[in-house]
From Swiss-Prot:
This protein's name: AP2/ERF and B3 domain-containing transcription factor At1g50680
Source species taxonomy: Eukaryota, Viridiplantae, Streptophyta, Embryophyta, Tracheophyta
One of the GO BP terms on file: ethylene-activated signaling pathway
A single Gene Ontology CC term: nucleus
Places the protein is found: Nucleus
Keyword Iron tagged: no
Gene Ontology MF annotations: DNA binding; DNA-binding transcription factor activity
Source organism: Arabidopsis thaliana
Length: 337
């Protein structure tokens, strides 16, 4: 909980971050003990010190530092954490992708970060539990009879991955008939450099998809004149690695319409695109999801996860923090060994 602002110079030039030793000989980066007994949090980025606020405990200040480091030091966030990643904090990068760096820092300073992160997790788990995957013949906008809070995702097309799709070229070729019909319009009258880097008057777009876990994926979509193909480039390699994609796996693309009575994530439209993976099995078949399968009906685990998140993220700020053997992290009591 943030108590007050730094009196002066919230952003000043300095050389190296400070480390504080809290109770139990635990060292926290970016935490400064103050004369009034409270704890300040700060982080260094581009050789500048950014003030994050004042907190009641060193643990809260250290947590604020970890959250800020995700946005400011995403390239090596693992090297700058006070606490190990958990099943809860692993969702922070996705949450922060919805906001600018300035907005994330302001939320940390004004004390609203943890509340908005909690809301993000709850809304996302509710969306996952409401998705109804439909086949290509399902009518777009069809009303689900089981619940008006479910929304259907209609398949646009699918593609079996080739060796080059998951190889060193770091690109996915979209078949022309699907690219023209379903993807945003881009001009095919372009010149390009080697390795697909386009120069001159270029038209390429960033397309945004969500997977089944409602994690956002952004791909650069453009036209390669040399091979006369429509491709996903930037962002595709990360998706391949994260999903451990192999040759003959199938990628399916969907369009999803969200009813007005269902909340969406920050910045997410009521109509969005979804990307799903059907893995190729050892027996030579593709393990696909059943048509019209509702996720929350087929997966009790999703509901359990939603209940767990709600339980773990209950607001306990008014409760005592007298337990000397632990600390509070996003409303959860973490016991120290």
């Amino acid at each position: 909980m943030r108590l007050d602002d730094e009196p002066e110079n919230a952003l000043v030039v300095s050389s190296s971050p400070k480390t504080v030793v809290a109770s139990g000989n635990v060292k926290y980066k970016g935490v400064v003990q103050q004369q009034n007994g409270h704890w300040g949090a700060q982080i260094y980025a581009d050789h500048k010190r950014i003030w994050l606020g004042t907190f009641k405990s060193a643990d809260e200040a250290a947590t604020a530092y970890d959250s800020a480091s995700i946005k400011l030091r995403s390239f090596d966030a693992n090297s700058h954490r006070n606490f190990p990643w958990s099943t809860i904090t692993l969702n922070e990068p996705d949450f922060q992708n919805c906001y600018t760096t300035e907005t994330v820092l302001n939320m940390i300073r004004d004390g609203s970060y943890q509340h908005k992160f909690r809301d993000f997790l709850r809304i996302r788990s509710q969306i996952v539990a409401s998705i109804n995957i439909g086949g290509p013949k399902q009518a777009r906008g069809e009303v689900n009879q089981e619940s008006d809070k479910c929304f259907s995702c209609t398949q646009l097309f699918q593609k079996e991955l080739t060796p080059s799709d998951v190889g060193k070229l770091n690109r996915l070729v979209i078949p022309k008939k699907y690219a023209v019909k379903y993807m945003p319009f881009i001009s095919a009258d372009q010149s390009e450099k080697e390795e697909g880097e386009i120069v001159g008057s270029v038209e390429d777009v960033e397309v945004v998809f969500y997977d089944r876990a409602m994690r956002q994926w952004k791909f650069r979509y453009c036209y390669w004149k040399s091979s006369q193909s429509f491709v996903f480039t930037r962002g595709w390699n990360s998706f391949v690695k994260e999903k451990n994609l192999k040759e003959k796996d199938v990628i399916a693309f969907y369009t999803c319409d969200v009813p007005n009575n269902v909340k969406t994530l920050e910045g997410q439209r009521k109509n969005f695109l979804m990307i799903d993976v059907h893995c190729f099995s050892d027996n030579g078949s593709v393990v696909a999801e059943e048509v019209s399968m509702t996720v929350h009906d087929s997966s009790v685990q999703v509901k359990k996860t939603e209940n767990l998140v709600s339980s773990m993220l209950e607001d306990k700020e008014t409760k005592s923090e007298e337990n000397k053997g632990g600390f509070m992290l996003f409303g959860v009591r973490i016991e120290c060994p």
